[in-house]
């Protein structure tokens, strides 16, 4: 049983449980979201985790958290409530060194290869390895699946069972979802993109041949980092064939970054709405 489609609030978790026939399930997987310190602690009171996952840390929601240290503190609330062990992404593991629960640095993935039609990688547990492929795009997808694999292994699934499940994972709507239409590849990454997600999406875009066009309103909810991160985003777009910026305020630092990195002014435009773009 899982919480559906980013239903990561107290009401969302409660609805998932109340609407299910619990006797049909052995495991409940709950997504926990936060915009303020204390939000995850509240969710853990409702649903205390046996095994928890921290998939990463970035500046998303700094507008409401205020500081990066508050983001780390909020994520750490799940570790304070974890009964068995926590699986933590390698690139942020050290941020949680002071928490007492058993912590596992996600290290079961290796030899990641990225293609237009998916991602191949190796999963290894207790000296046994399996080569797997997912239709999900980008190296970050391999690392996200590895986190899930660590959790699955922790609750008793075998490596073969995990490996067989990887190809069955489907696209998540609006999260780097590949849509083929009339000979055109569309990467729909429209859901609440953060800094890491935007960088990953651009790397995936580079895997494809042909003209590369990006439509973006910029990155939101970054607080004091909003100007800097949107400027950096603009620099990363400078080598593309065309860029369409949507909106008014956030797109200005994106355009400045684009120009700073040598982007062609004839290949970028600003439109007021997504429909106009």
Predicted regions and their residues:
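Short, intrinsically disordered, charge-balanced linker/junction segments flanking boundaries
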Residues: 270-277
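Phosphate-binding loop of NTP-binding sites
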Residues: 1-90, 95-99
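Acidic, Mg2+-coordinating active-site environments of NTP-dependent enzymes
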Residues: 53-186, 210-211, 234-242, 251-268
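Buried hydrophobic packing segments
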Residues: 13-17, 145-155, 201, 205
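Conserved strand-to-helix beginnings and helix N-cap segments that scaffold or border functional pockets
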Residues: 14, 40, 65-68, 145, ...
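Residue-level marker for buried hydrophobic side chains located in beta-strands
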Residues: 28, 186, 214-215
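AMP-binding/adenylate-forming catalytic core of the ANL superfamily
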Residues: 71, 193-255
């Amino acid at each position: 049983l899982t919480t559906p489609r980013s239903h990561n609030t107290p009401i969302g978790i409660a609805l998932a449980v109340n609407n299910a026939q619990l006797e049909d399930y052995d495991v409940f997987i709950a997504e926990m979201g936060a915009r303020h310190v204390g939000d995850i602690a509240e969710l853990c009171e409702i649903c205390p985790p046996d095994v928890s996952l921290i998939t990463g840390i970035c500046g998303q929601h700094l507008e409401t958290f205020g500081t990066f240290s508050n983001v780390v503190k909020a994520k750490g609330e799940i570790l304070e409530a974890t009964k068995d062990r926590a699986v933590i992404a390698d690139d942020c593991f050290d941020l949680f060194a002071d928490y007492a629960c058993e912590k596992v640095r996600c290290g079961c993935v290796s030899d990641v290869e990225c293609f237009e039609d998916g991602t191949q990688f190796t999963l290894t547990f207790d000296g046994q390895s399996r080569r797997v492929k997912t239709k999900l795009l980008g190296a970050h997808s391999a690392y996200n699946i590895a986190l899930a694999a660590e959790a699955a292994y922790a609750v008793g699934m075998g490596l073969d069972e995990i490996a067989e499940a990887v190809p069955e994972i489907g696209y998540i709507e609006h999260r780097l979802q590949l849509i083929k239409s009339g000979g055109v590849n569309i990467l729909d990454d429209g859901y609440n993109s953060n800094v890491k997600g935007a960088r990953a999406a651009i790397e995936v875009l580079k895997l494809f041949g042909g003209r590369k066009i990006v439509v973006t309103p910029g990155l939101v909810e970054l607080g004091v980092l909003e100007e800097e991160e949107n400027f950096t985003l603009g620099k990363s777009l400078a080598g593309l064939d065309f860029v369409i910026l949507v909106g008014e305020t956030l797109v200005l630092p994106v355009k400045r970054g684009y120009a700073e990195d040598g982007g062609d002014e004839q290949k970028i435009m600003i439109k007021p709405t997504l429909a106009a773009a």
